[in-house]
């Protein structure tokens, strides 16, 4: 069962917390984004109502409708958890959800198109953009000062730009870089 469109992966379940069905979540990003969610989509389970959320460094604990025992929580271990994009809280300026970057054009320093962001991966120490281009796909580190997120008047992302001093070959073979 694939996650529905217009959802963002928040992280994955680490295992039970306590004996009443709490589930620890490894959170991609800020755990505060989970605190006010009314529901989450769980791999293999579908939409579940969030009864209560607790902050627990470095992630959170979710108490979900229908998950009332340690055994039920254990069954969720390793499953991905998603939120509806519309349910996510607004972020501070300069921060973006992954779903806001998907589909953005990738341009060189002169504004010429190079490809499009297909996905975003959290590799731990930095985010990687999966960019589709004429030569296939490439991983592009979302790393200043060479790769910048360009924003519009709304402050939301509009494009990804490689700077003039970006190392050659960032997008691999087949991409026409400046």
Swiss-Prot record:
InterPro entries, per database record: PRC-brl_dom, PRC_barrel-like_sf, RimM, RimM_N, RimM_N_sf
Q: Which GO terms describe its molecular function?
A: ribosome binding
Q: PRC barrel domain location, by residue?
A: 93-170
The record's Gene Ontology biological-process terms are: ribosomal small subunit biogenesis; rRNA processing
Using the UniProt record, give the first listed, main subcellular location: cytoplasm
Q: Name one GO cellular component term.
A: ribosome
Q: Please give the positions of the paired cysteines in each disulfide bond.
A: none
Family stated for the protein in its record: Belongs to the RimM family.
The annotated subunit structure for this chain is: Binds ribosomal protein uS19.
Which PANTHER family does the record cross-reference, listed alphabetically?
RIBOSOME MATURATION FACTOR RIMM
Q: What's the stated role of this polypeptide?
A: An accessory protein needed during the final step in the assembly of 30S ribosomal subunit, possibly for assembly of the head region. Essential for efficient processing of 16S rRNA. May be needed both before and after RbfA during the maturation of 16S rRNA. It has affinity for free ribosomal 30S subunits but not for 70S ribosomes.
Q: What is this protein called?
A: Ribosome maturation factor RimM
């Amino acid at each position: 069962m694939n996650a529905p469109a217009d959802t963002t992966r928040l992280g994955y379940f680490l295992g039970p917390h306590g004996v009443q069905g709490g589930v620890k979540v490894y959170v991609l990003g800020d755990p505060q984004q989970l605190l006010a969610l009314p529901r989450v989509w769980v791999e293999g389970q579908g939409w579940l109502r969030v009864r209560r959320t607790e902050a627990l460094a470095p992630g959170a604990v979710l108490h979900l409708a229908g998950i009332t025992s340690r055994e039920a929580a254990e069954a969720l271990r390793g499953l991905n958890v998603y939120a509806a994009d519309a349910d996510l809280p607004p972020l501070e300026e300069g921060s973006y959800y992954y779903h806001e970057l998907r589909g953005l054009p990738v341009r060189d320093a002169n504004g010429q198109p190079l490809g499009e962001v297909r996905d975003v991966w959290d590799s731990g120490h930095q985010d990687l953009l999966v960019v589709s281009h004429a030569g296939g796909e490439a991983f592009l580190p979302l790393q200043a000062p060479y790769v910048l997120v360009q924003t519009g008047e709304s402050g939301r992302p509009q494009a990804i730009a490689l700077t003039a001093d970006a190392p050659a070959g960032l997008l691999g073979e087949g991409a026409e870089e400046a």
